[in-house]
Amino acid sequence: SATGLYSRATGRNAEAAGTASFATGYGVVADQDNSMSIGQFNALQTEGALFIVGNGADANMRSNAFEVHSSGNAVIHGDAVVEGTVFAGPYDVASTLGSLVSTVDSLQTVIAELQTQLEALTGGE
């Protein structure tokens, strides 16, 4: 049912309660103003959410798979599988992480060598 002003609801037991909200799916509720909820049995009262994909089991076990908030943050509840390159600004995340791990490994080797030299100079004390 669509109880919010300028709202629409489609599907089975879907409810659009927020102003200018839209809900479609099974047991979904769009309870935030200017929001859209799809899927099934999304979590209720998700503050600041504009877009929600619900993946709950039933009305007593509500949960979200994905959320986009008015702050610009996106929240994935579960693993994110990426087929392609992930960039953070201009940086290829996987390449940068690999480079950092390699640098840390090199530094650990240097530290171990320096520790050995220090022990030799101090007589192991």
Predicted feature locations:
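Positively charged, low-complexity intrinsically disordered regions
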Residues: 9, 13, 109, 116-118
